[in-house]
Amino acid sequence: MAFSASLFRTKTVHTEDAFCPRSAIQAEQPPNIIDCIPVAGYEAALITNALFLLVLFVFNPLTCKGNWIKAILFYSLLLYNMILAIFLVVDTQHFVSALLLAYVVTFLVLWTADRIRLSCAVGSVLPFVDMRSSYIRVDNGNSSVVVPMNHTKHWFIRNFEQSCHCENCFYIHSSSYVECTFISRLKKSILVSVCDFSLGGNVSTVFVPSSDKTVPLHIIAPSKLYV
């Protein structure tokens, strides 16, 4: 039986080609680890990033520091998603990569438009740092103060002596209020003072929406006032 020497010639097979099948066009280009990621990997990245962004919106911290941390995480995740999407679209031609990029860009455009609109209404860049969507703006002629609110209620309590607790973000210290405005994503209302009350030597003023109709007023005054 005759044997040909060609049967014993060695053939070099690159690891990338063995574990990562490539098309004829891709074979002419240098191997890239991104080409070896299956489409399921892109789908998992898209779903995971979408869920993370939704969880950030559902999570509603009560403190100012918690909202700042939430904003930092949101912008960091958005930047990561943008870089990941662009990187995948440039190095691959998968439909899911383009879908991820479109999702992130759309999300960023809508969020930026919403924050710009709120910033213009509030007259401050605070909406870009604090992700809440309800604010109280107080003007005294010379200066103004913007306070983010955890709730969408119109009620606002002014307390001259009680220290500001960041958990509430309702207390502002001034004795010459000229205008008090409640601003949210959907409405803007002028608040007027209706009554004063004293608790433990601390004088407070209750503000409610300006209205021609009767406004229900319920005041509970514990040692620490919460609205």
UniProtKB/Swiss-Prot annotation:
<feature type="domain" description="CoV 3a-like viroporin TM">
    <location>
        <begin position="27"/>
        <end position="130"/>
    </location>
</feature>
<dbReference type="GO" id="GO:0016020">
    <property type="term" value="C:membrane"/>
</dbReference>
<dbReference type="InterPro" id="IPR046445">
    <property type="entry name" value="a/bCoV_VIROPORIN_3A-like_TM"/>
</dbReference>
<feature type="domain" description="CoV 3a-like viroporin CD">
    <location>
        <begin position="134"/>
        <end position="191"/>
    </location>
</feature>
<keyword id="KW-1043">Host membrane</keyword>
<dbReference type="GO" id="GO:0033644">
    <property type="term" value="C:host cell membrane"/>
</dbReference>
<keyword id="KW-0472">Membrane</keyword>
<feature type="transmembrane region" description="Helical">
    <location>
        <begin position="39"/>
        <end position="59"/>
    </location>
</feature>
<keyword id="KW-0812">Transmembrane</keyword>
<dbReference type="InterPro" id="IPR046446">
    <property type="entry name" value="a/bCoV_VIROPORIN_3A-like_CD"/>
</dbReference>
<dbReference type="InterPro" id="IPR044323">
    <property type="entry name" value="MERS-CoV-like_ORF5"/>
</dbReference>
<feature type="transmembrane region" description="Helical">
    <location>
        <begin position="71"/>
        <end position="91"/>
    </location>
</feature>
<protein>
    <recommendedName>
        <fullName>Non-structural protein 3d</fullName>
    </recommendedName>
</protein>
<keyword id="KW-1133">Transmembrane helix</keyword>
<feature type="transmembrane region" description="Helical">
    <location>
        <begin position="93"/>
        <end position="113"/>
    </location>
</feature>
